[in-house]
């Protein structure tokens, strides 16, 4: 029987939705047979370029390392990595050029293992030239020793190597948790509880979307129809579209030809809004606050979109219409989620990635029920076997922790975000992106299962 061997891989991306590409690469490697995969924090660093490289190649990278176990040989592993890189659209003709994903074998086997072939050299020949890689390896296996005959670093631990080759000032531009992506919220309404009309004007909304992306959101959620409990009238299609269309037009102009970009999500329960949006912008997500209607599911299938199903007991939410008090809210949401996923699978959606489950914090739940639902993330992931998103940002349930205004609940939001991250949540929908992103990165420094 083939033995399982330690492996350390590096991942880099500087094209497209960099965070999403790295997460997809993790999934591909697990399918290829790598088990117990654990990723470091993701560091954003400046591109390393050959002299004379085109200026347009100077795009910051997302970098991380992951450790795991494999039965593949180093050469077989490299072949699998190249298959993944090709599937993601990497252009191998551009030496040191931009790429959606780059995967390298850094270390393999026991500490003394070394090999050299036409396709793979272990340890990686440029490892000691990359302080950020040394730092990341040290975060996952600080006492593993580096062995390379003839090297002055032969036999030193990675903890010591990280001290010998420290990160240069300014080398790290930012950091991200590897397992949880952030969806940034843009409310294009005059009646949102948390934003109170700040982004109703199209240019301000588009600028805010760009700012959230710059702060670390890998998904931008645009909503032009408020659905909070204070709403008595949910308006009509034309009113919602009149707010959303100019923002999409501006973003289409500003992000046209961009080398790095977020996914864009539309927060609506109206299929007509999605049909119109697709015609002017390459949206990637439908955020259906009605819980995933059949028409929305068919749109997701037709256009290859991800469908976020947000549970709500009523639209808009009403204080007299909430989950039962006689049964765990987690159990109730699992039952609803299983029913929805079964329906979507019959339609032809791949529920392992295309459907994202959101238990709908504060949508027909009391504050206590909402907090209990956040405790259930691990159960949702294990039983439903689909990605999970939590939208807890500035929600009324946080009033259990103090009577702060909606706009002043970001501290509580971030605290819950870290707890949700530790439970393995896939996505967090938040208003204040930078604070959440930095907190999740700090929480992930010692590594996260992926």
Residue ranges and their predicted role:
Residues 48, 52, 56-62, 75-172:
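Flexible, gly/pro- and Lys/Arg-enriched active-site loops
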Residues 162-190, 345, 349, 404, ...:
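N-terminal amphipathic alpha-helix/helix-capping segment at the start of soluble metabolic enzymes
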Residues 2-49:
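N-terminal beta1-alpha1 ligand-phosphate binding loop
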Residues 7, 182, 264, 307, ...:
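Hydrophobic/aromatic residues located in beta-strands of well-ordered beta-sheets
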Residues 180-184, 211-224:
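N-terminal glycine-rich anion-binding loops that anchor highly charged ligand groups
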Residues 13, 66-72, 107-110:
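Short beta-strand-to-loop capping motifs
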Residues 192-211, 227-257, 263, 269-271, ...:
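Active-site-adjacent loop and "lid" segments of alpha/beta metabolic enzymes
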Residues 38-70, 224-231, 235:
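Short, charge-patterned binding micro-sites
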């Amino acid at each position: 029987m083939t033995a399982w061997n330690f492996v350390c891989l590096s991942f880099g991306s500087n094209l497209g939705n960099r965070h999403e590409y790295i997460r997809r690469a993790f999934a591909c490697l697990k399918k290829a047979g790598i088990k117990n995969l654990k990723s470091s924090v993701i560091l954003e660093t400046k591109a390393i370029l050959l002299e004379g490289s085109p200026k347009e190649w100077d795009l910051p990278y997302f970098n991380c390392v992951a450790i795991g176990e494999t039965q593949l040989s180093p050469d077989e592993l490299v072949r699998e990595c190249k298959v993944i890189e090709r599937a993601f659209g990497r252009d191998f003709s551009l030496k040191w050029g931009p790429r959606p994903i780059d995967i390298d074998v850094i270390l393999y086997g026991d500490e003394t293992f070394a090999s050299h072939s036409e396709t793979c050299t272990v340890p990686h020949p440029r490892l000691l030239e990359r302080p950020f890689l040394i730092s990341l390896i040290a975060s996952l296996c600080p006492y593993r020793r580096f062995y390379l005959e003839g090297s002055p670093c032969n036999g030193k631990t990675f903890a010591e190597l990280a001290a010998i080759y420290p990160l240069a000032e300014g080398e790290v531009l930012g950091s991200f948790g590897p397992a949880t992506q952030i969806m940034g919220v843009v409310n294009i309404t005059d009646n949102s509880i948390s934003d109170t009309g700040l982004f109703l004007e199209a240019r301000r909304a588009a600028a805010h979307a760009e700012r959230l992306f710059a702060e670390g959101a890998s998904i931008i959620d645009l909503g032009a129809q408020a659905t909070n409990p204070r709403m008595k009238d949910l308006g009509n299609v034309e009113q919602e579209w009149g707010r959303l269309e100019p923002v999409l037009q501006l973003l289409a102009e500003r992000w046209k030809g961009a080398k790095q970009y977020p996914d864009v999500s539309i927060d609506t329960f109206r299929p007509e809004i999605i049909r119109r949006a697709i015609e002017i912008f390459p949206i990637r997500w439908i955020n259906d606050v009605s819980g995933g209607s059949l028409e929305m599911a068919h749109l997701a299938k037709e256009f290859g979109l991800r469908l976020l199903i947000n549970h709500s007991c009523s639209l808009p939410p009403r204080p007299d219409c909430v989950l039962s008090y006689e049964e765990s809210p987690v159990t109730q949401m699992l039952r609803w989620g299983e029913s929805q996923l079964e329906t979507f699978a019959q339609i032809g959606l791949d529920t392992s990635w295309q459907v994202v489950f959101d238990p709908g914090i504060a949508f027909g739940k009391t504050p206590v029920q909402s907090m209990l639902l956040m405790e259930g993330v691990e159960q949702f992931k294990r039983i439903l076997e689909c990605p999970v998103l939590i939208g807890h940002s500035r929600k009324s349930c946080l009033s259990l922790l103090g009577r702060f205004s909606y706009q002043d609940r970001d501290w509580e939001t971030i605290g819950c975000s870290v707890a949700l991250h530790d439970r393995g949540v896939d996505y967090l929908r938040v208003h204040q992106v930078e604070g959440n992103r930095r907190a999740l990165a700090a929480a992930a420094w010692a590594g996260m299962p992926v």
